[in-house]
């Protein structure tokens, strides 16, 4: 048996591994559907999607089968199914759980492991237990949920998406409601304009297509003769084709993304939370 660093860290807390859950092929889409297993249905209403890619985990937790399940996230794969299934899905800061290893030339490591649960308390308890075995030295200790939190936070509030467009009214309203709650608790609230640069979405799509390419070739190398790339589903095939079609654009896109990572880290020096 072989365990990733994150898997070993989770198992070392004493959690029991019951089995694997459904994901889309290679976890590359925001819904959990595959040719092999079909669609994973939302337990609240089987006519709806669980979201993805950690849809199987989210369905099990939402249905009450287990109180907590492993999930991971590159571009929303914890947060999307948590939202669809009415759960808590936290993509924690890099390093809270041991990161997946990615090639050093990538502009950032966006692949994070985590869990989905039914309450903030459960998610907090999981991360507090994780750090007992392998603390995240670059961050303050999480501690127990019963501890007080006397420090007042500076919270940036953003209601635009990464394209600079307004989000749907109900999402804007929910964001303002949370901001007012935080303000009532004594935290400092500041509305901000969109910090993302104009080509961010285009560059991120090139990064995502590159992930499709990386996964296809790393899996092919791992399985060698057992891997038949002609059996890939349409979405991975599309991403790989998009990567090759736009490969001349990748270096500049990665440079802009790497620059944005640095700019964003500087931006967050002025705030504790971006809401």
Describe every region a protein language model picked out.
Residues 1, 149-158, 207-265:
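Short helix-loop capping/hinge segments that flank enzyme active sites or metal/cofactor-binding pockets
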Residues 5-6, 30, 56, 178, ...:
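Residues within well-ordered alpha-helices
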Residues 11-127:
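Short glycine/serine-rich loop segments
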Residues 21, 191-198:
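Acidic carboxylate-rich catalytic motifs and surrounding loops in phosphoryl-/glycosyl-chemistry enzymes
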Residues 34, 38, 201-214:
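Charged, often glycine-rich, active-site loop that binds/positions anionic groups
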Residues 91-177:
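A short helix-breaking turn/cap at a secondary-structure junction
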Residues 167-193, 217-226, 250-271:
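Acyltransferase
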């Amino acid at each position: 048996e072989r365990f990733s660093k994150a898997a070993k860290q989770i198992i070392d807390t004493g959690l029991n591994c019951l089995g694997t859950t459904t994901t889309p092929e290679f976890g590359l889409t925001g819904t959990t559907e595959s040719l092999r297993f079909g669609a994973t249905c939302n337990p609240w209403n089987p006519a709806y999607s669980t979201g993805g890619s950690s849809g199987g985990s989210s369905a099990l937790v939402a249905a009450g089968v287990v109180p907590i399940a492993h999930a991971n996230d590159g571009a929303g794969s914890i947060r999307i199914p948590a939202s669809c299934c009415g759960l808590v899905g936290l993509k924690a800061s890099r390093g809270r759980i041991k990161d997946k290893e990615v090639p050093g030339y990538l502009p950032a490591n966006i692949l994070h492991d985590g869990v989905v649960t039914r309450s903030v308390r459960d998610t907090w308890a999981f991360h507090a237990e994780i750090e007992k075995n392998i603390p995240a030295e670059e961050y303050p200790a999480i501690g127990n949920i019963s501890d007080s939190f006397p420090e007042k936070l500076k919270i940036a509030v953003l209601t635009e998406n990464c394209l600079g467009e307004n989000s749907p009214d109900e999402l804007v309203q929910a964001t303002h409601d949370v901001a007012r709650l935080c303000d009532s608790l004594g935290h400092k609230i500041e509305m901000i304009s969109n910090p993302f640069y104009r080509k961010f979405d285009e560059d991120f799509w090139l990064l995502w297509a590159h992930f499709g390419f990386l996964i296809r070739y790393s899996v092919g190398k791992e399985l060698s003769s057992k891997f038949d790339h002609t059996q890939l589903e349409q979405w991975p095939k599309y991403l790989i084709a998009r990567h090759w079609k736009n490969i001349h654009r990748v270096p500049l896109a990665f440079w802009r993304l790497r620059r944005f990572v640095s700019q964003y880290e500087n931006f967050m020096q002025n705030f504790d939370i971006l809401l």
